[in-house]
Amino acid sequence: MSDDMVEFLNQLPGWAKEMGFHILTATEDEVTCEFEVAEKHHQGYGIVHGGVHCGVIETLASIGAAIVGGKRGQRVVGLENNTSFIRAVRSGKLTAQAKPVTRGRSTQVWEAWVRDADGKLVAQGRVRLLCLDDKHTI
């Protein structure tokens, strides 16, 4: 995907922008991003909230699936997000990566990993997405 598309994705309004996710790559084979942990990412104990991990995983899976679906004239929406929290994080830069497991005509499945600055796994997940033809409304 072109640098213009990555720049476009980074300018989109919404939750991912508010969370400070910075897309690094976006192709039908891999989507990556990074973000610096801030207080807005914390839950009550001062560690990154599990919803942030779920959100970054679903965001990257959705971008990748949308690239695939877009080539077919489809839109995609999430059906299921199963994220495991492996290691607590309080601060630092996190990097996330998503890759497809299957890119079917009606559903796609993507796996994703979130790692800390030392490369240690902090969360991993799997997202199942529904591919909708243009005749369907969201």
Regions found by a protein language model. Give the residues of each.
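Terminal targeting signals and extreme-terminal segments of soluble enzymes
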Residues: 1-138
